[in-house]
Amino acid sequence: MAILGNKTNEVQSAAQKVKVKTTTTTIVAENHPSRNGLSIVNTGSQNVWLGFGKAAVENEGALLTPGGSWNGMHGPMLWTGSVMGIAPAGETSVTVTEV
């Protein structure tokens, strides 16, 4: 069981390692309207740019530096749409966990 705020939810799936490519946008997390939690951690050695509901583009969206993470929140709201990623400097990986 994973704890999210005051809620206890079953983790939807084990943490998934996703390879993020350099020239094409990779789907990091699918659109999931009933998502209760999301964590994306850059476990690779290259920067990753995240696009929300659209293709990821360098210098737009959110930047995850190596070792950086994003908790799925936009202000007070949990993002339930798709998350795309691109790593312009070289292929790298992120770990994604959804609740």
Please give the residue ranges for each predicted region.
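Beta-sandwich interaction modules
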Residues: 30, 65-79
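Hydrophobic beta-strand residues in large extracellular and virion-surface proteins
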Residues: 40, 50, 83, 94-96
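Short, charged recognition helix plus adjacent turn
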Residues: 20, 58, 64-65
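Surface-exposed ligand/attachment interfaces on beta-rich extracellular proteins
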Residues: 12-33
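Noncatalytic modules at the cell exterior or secretory-pathway interfaces
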Residues: 36-38, 75-91
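Short, surface-exposed beta-strand/strand-loop-strand elements in extracellular ectodomains
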Residues: 41-61
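Short, intrinsically disordered N-terminal pre-domain segments
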Residues: 1-19, 93-99
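Forkhead-associated
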Residues: 33-43
